[in-house]
Amino acid sequence: MAAAAQSRVVRVLSMSRSAITAIATSVCHGPPCRQLHHALMPHGKGGRSSVSGIVATVFGATGFLGRYVVNHLGRMGSQVIIPYRCDKYDIMHLRPMGDLGQLLFLEWDARDKDSIRRVVQHSNVVINLIGRDWETKNFDFEDVFVKIPQAIAQLSKEAGVEKFIHVSHLNANIKSSSRYLRNKAVGEKVVRDAFPEAIIVKPSDIFGREDRFLNSFASMHRFGPIPLGSLGWKTVKQPVYVVDVSKGIVNAVKDPDANGKSFAFVGPSRYLLFHLVKYIFAVAHRLFLPFPLPLFAYRWVARVFEISPFEPWITRDKVERMHITDMKLPHLPGLEDLGIQATPLELKAIEVLRRHRTYRWLSAEIEDVKPAKTVNI
């Protein structure tokens, strides 16, 4: 009888949320002291209706990479907090990615620390995917890649966040000719200073259905001949698939040994820019007519697009990034170290480029397209 009564008491305590909270509070010594809640206690067999124990705040979730990260987190039963600044209709596509109550949408102000603190205070994981391809009068590259990530990292550290993941770029370099890449490098440093255990992800150019990489090159057919600096013979690219990057980020969240490391996410093959763009046009069944355009002239053309009131198709900084060879960083761990086999460009290019075809070739397969020529430099 005594044993049975004792087992009943134990079962009652184990199901009592108030008791769990009291125990968690009593054993927490020193700031920051965070209460244990149901979303942090894993249960279920896996899948969207389970609870993974991860409560993740994903900054930049409304962007290209963000939708894939949110989907992978939701698929494993994580609770995802999504800060947003856009119209509510622009986040509707994210709602089906998690079970009922698992996706929480909160408006935030990137320059308001109280707003940032509010969206990270209940999370044990914070992922920063905030990015911008061009500068605006409201946010320049220093704001987007340095000041905002620094504030998020500092406030996440103060809130007791266990894992912080910051997405930078493979070619981030303080000496780069690109202002974008220089600020990416500074952003890595300030994040590491504010959150020493941060995981820094350095992907190369990312391709996928909604990208500004393959789609950008493919859309050049509207202008006729394709301008490339030095015809693309001096630039080497190693693009990586967006799903691989997303899986790598989620696996880094689950890997206890990833803290404090930097990861280089790249595709399996390197291509000369000339061969890469030629392959893009072959898959899109478009006529490839390249011509060499000096970079100073390319920048002048880009300046015309910058002063347009519409979204710029090209900017001077993008011209610089387009013609920078992707770094080789063999000393850094990569996708393979997180259990992911990088996807070849040739397997997924058709998903991105089919929409650039004319109606005649819309349903054609890609067996007749020769794979892009790779290089080892």
Curated annotation (Swiss-Prot):
Q: How is the cofactor bound?
A: Binds 1 FAD per subunit.
Q: Name one GO molecular function term.
A: NADH dehydrogenase activity
Task: Read off the Pfam families from this record.
Answer: Epimerase
Question: Which of the residues bear the PTM N6-succinyllysine?
Answer: 175
Listed cofactors: FAD
The entry's cellular-component GO terms read: mitochondrial inner membrane; mitochondrial matrix; mitochondrial membrane; mitochondrion; nucleus; respiratory chain complex I
Record note on modification? Acetylated on lysine residues. BLOC1S1 is required for acetylation. Acetylated by CLOCK in a circadian manner.
What changing residue 360 to C does, per the record, is:
In MC1DN26; loss of function in complex I assembly; accumulation of several low and high molecular weight assembly intermediates is observed in patient fibroblasts
- On the tree of life, the source organism's domain of life is Eukaryota
The record's listing under CDD domains reads: NDUFA9_like_SDR_a
What span is annotated as transit peptide? 1-35
A Gene Ontology biological process noted in the UniProt record is: sodium ion transport
Residues modified as N6-acetyllysine are 189, 370
> Which UniProt keywords are listed?
Acetylation, Disease variant, Electron transport, FAD, Flavoprotein, Mitochondrion, Primary mitochondrial disease, Respiratory chain, Transit peptide, Transport
Location within or outside the cell: Mitochondrion matrix
Instruction: Tell me the InterPro entries matching this sequence.
Output: ComplexI_NDUFA9_subunit (IPR051207), Epimerase_deHydtase (IPR001509), NAD(P)-bd_dom_sf (IPR036291)
State the disease linkage annotated in the record: Mitochondrial complex I deficiency, nuclear type 26: A form of mitochondrial complex I deficiency, the most common biochemical signature of mitochondrial disorders, a group of highly heterogeneous conditions characterized by defective oxidative phosphorylation, which collectively affects 1 in 5-10000 live births. Clinical disorders have variable severity, ranging from lethal neonatal disease to adult-onset neurodegenerative disorders.
Relate the assembly described in the record. Complex I is composed of 45 different subunits. This a component of the hydrophobic protein fraction. Interacts with BLOC1S1. Interacts with SLC2A4. Interacts with CLOCK. Interacts with RAB5IF.
* Functional note: Accessory subunit of the mitochondrial membrane respiratory chain NADH dehydrogenase (Complex I), that is believed not to be involved in catalysis. Required for proper complex I assembly. Complex I functions in the transfer of electrons from NADH to the respiratory chain. The immediate electron acceptor for the enzyme is believed to be ubiquinone.
Similarity remark: Belongs to the complex I NDUFA9 subunit family.
Task: Report the protein name in the record.
Answer: NADH dehydrogenase [ubiquinone] 1 alpha subcomplex subunit 9, mitochondrial
Organism of origin: Homo sapiens (Human)
Q: Which gene encodes it?
A: NDUFA9
